[in-house]
């Protein structure tokens, strides 16, 4: 007993001694601060060398763009981690985004156990603890986040480590307010200068690689391809089922490319008939046709110097394909009704959900255009092939929906498990629609299994197609969810508890669905 107590005291004294030394050195670093970025990096070095806190990270919040950017990151072997300075978080996103949104410290005994852990840096040790604390600014509002990993997994030390980091965060926040905030605050927000962009240009916020959700091998590979292809003007063909996020990929490529400051213009090739396509893409001169009362630039001119995203390219006609091929080959075009040849410098990103090789074989798609577009193909996997991403996607989308609805939303683990049992024929778009519908139905703000409704009749979740009843042959797989519920109730003699057992659900779930699906219960 006495030996154990002495040992514990020694450890505590060692911790306090190291923390005092580290705090003293951090105070010296901050007192001599002249350059914010360099100063913050020095603070993280002290945390690593003197306080045994590895992978330190300091993020600062830009309230105008509503993003949390990495300002300093503990370097490995004195080398900057690739892409780390481009990674950003929104309030409520990931662990650091959660700390910013809540303004409270977050302590995890094992970082990988928390489903909010995004691991975008591919840096952290999954088995070690993780601590993130807010940098508090004026009026008790967070202006950033300090995060680090203790080098040892000693849970009894976590409270002391957290208090230490909170003290360091207070010192950092005070220095940042003195060095950075007065400059940006000198001008009222409403008077801040605005940079006018072309109307066709989409804001880059929300389209960086940091906003692509998914840690599956397939998504990691796609992110690597985007990083590589973004640097060049190579034509890209994005392929994937409807709802997989092809436009998001195109946006990410553009906004991470040297053309990011120019326009990103999108055009759906299936949205207009042939007689309007040419005018829409190439523009027209005044009087070129009835109703052409003025000259109008087409999408190619609007995208000059930037990127043109041609969605649903597989739906285009032979006539359209011929005109498109010419401009891809020569970089030249004329407006409808004009004779002046215009040169444009445009990067093309096309997208399709069709099997273009088969379309070429059938003569529906030009072979020469296919080879022009298919320089760098990117194939997006359907959501059913990356189920490990569903939980992260669900949390991401719930935060997005909560922001749009102006309220707090949460999703339960049970609801996540139910989502993972569904094969999502509509992919991410269907998942987002499902969660938005569930949020509307949830009065408490908790999205639980009870409020999740699927709308694809050919693809019921396993909870509605359990193996037991299916063996009896009573459940017709062609029925939609409402029809399945009625069939189960009829088989159970309209006893809700029995119907719930048949469907692998709880009686509460059955009762809720009866109400929202407007099923009339017979009087027994």
Curated annotation (Swiss-Prot):
Required for activation of most nif operons, which are directly involved in nitrogen fixation. Keywords: Activator, ATP-binding, DNA-binding, Nitrogen fixation, Nucleotide-binding, Transcription, Transcription regulation, Two-component regulatory system. Residues 212-481 form the Sigma-54 factor interaction domain. Residues 1-182 are annotated as: A domain. Signal peptide: none annotated. GO terms for biological process: nitrogen fixation; phosphorelay signal transduction system. Coiled coil: none annotated. GO terms for molecular function: ATP binding; ATP hydrolysis activity; DNA-binding transcription factor activity; sequence-specific DNA binding. It comes from the Bacteria. The keyword Lipid metabolism does not apply. It holds the Pfam family GAF. The gene is nifA. This is Nif-specific regulatory protein. Interacts with sigma-54. It comes from Klebsiella oxytoca. ATP binds at residues 240-247, 303-312. Residues 35-176 form the GAF domain. Residues 482-524 are annotated as: C-terminal DNA-binding domain. Residues 496-515 bind DNA.
């Amino acid at each position: 007993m006495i030996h154990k107590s002495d040992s514990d005291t020694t450890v505590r004294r060692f911790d306090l001694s190291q923390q005092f030394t580290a705090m003293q050195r951090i105070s010296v670093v901050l007192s001599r601060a002249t350059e914010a970025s360099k100063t913050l990096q020095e603070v993280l070095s002290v945390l690593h060398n003197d306080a045994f806190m590895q992978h330190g990270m300091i993020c600062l919040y830009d309230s105008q763009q509503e993003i949390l950017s990495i300002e300093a990151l503990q370097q490995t072997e004195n080398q900057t981690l690739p892409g780390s300075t481009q990674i950003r978080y929104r309030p409520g996103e990931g662990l650091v985004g959660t700390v910013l949104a809540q303004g409270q410290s977050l302590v995890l005994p094992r970082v990988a156990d928390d489903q909010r852990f995004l691991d975008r840096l591919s840096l952290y040790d999954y088995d070690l603890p993780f601590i993130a604390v807010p940098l508090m600014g004026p009026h008790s509002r967070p202006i950033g986040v300090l995060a680090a990993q203790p080098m040892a997994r000693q849970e009894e030390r976590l409270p002391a480590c957290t208090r230490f980091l909170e003290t360091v965060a207070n010192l950092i926040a005070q220095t940042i307010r003195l060095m950075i905030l007065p400059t940006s605050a000198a001008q009222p927000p409403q008077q801040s200068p605005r940079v006018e962009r072309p109307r066709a240009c989409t804001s880059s916020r929300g389209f960086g690689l940091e906003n692509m959700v998914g840690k599956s091998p397939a998504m990691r590979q796609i992110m690597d391809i985007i990083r590589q292809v973004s640097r060049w003007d190579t034509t890209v063909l994005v392929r994937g089922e409807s709802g997989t996020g092809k436009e998001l990929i195109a946006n990410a490529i553009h906004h991470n490319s040297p053309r990011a400051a120019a326009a990103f213009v999108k055009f759906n090739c299936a949205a207009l008939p042939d007689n309007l396509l040419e005018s829409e893409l190439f523009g027209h001169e005044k009087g070129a046709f009835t109703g052409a009362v003025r000259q109008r630039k087409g999408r190619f001119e609007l995208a000059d110097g930037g990127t043109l995203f041609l969605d649903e390219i597989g739906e285009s006609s032979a006539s359209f394909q011929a005109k498109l091929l010419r401009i891809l080959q020569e970089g030249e075009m004329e407006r409808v009704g004009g004779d002046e040849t215009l040169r444009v410098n445009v990067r093309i990103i096309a997208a399709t959900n069709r099997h273009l090789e088969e379309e070429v074989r059938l003569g529906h798609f030009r072979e020469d255009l296919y080879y022009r577009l298919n320089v760098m193909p990117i194939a997006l996997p359907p959501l059913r092939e990356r189920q490990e991403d569903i939980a992260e996607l669900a949390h991401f989308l719930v935060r997005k929906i909560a922001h749009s609805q102006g309220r707090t939303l949460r999703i339960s683990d049970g609801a996540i498990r139910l989502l993972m049992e569904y094969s999502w024929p509509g992919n991410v778009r269907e998942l987002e629609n499902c969660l938005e519908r569930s949020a509307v139905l949830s009065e408490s703000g908790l999205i639980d299994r009870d409020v999740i409704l699927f709308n694809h009749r050919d693809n019921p979740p396993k909870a509605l197609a359990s193996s037991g009843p299916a063996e009896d042959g009573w459940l017709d797989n062609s029925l939609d969810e409402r029809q399945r519920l009625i069939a189960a109730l009829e088989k159970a003699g309209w006893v809700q508890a029995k119907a719930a057992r048949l469907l692998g659900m709880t009686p509460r779930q059955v009762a809720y669905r009866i109400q929202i699906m407007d099923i009339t219960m017979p009087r027994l």
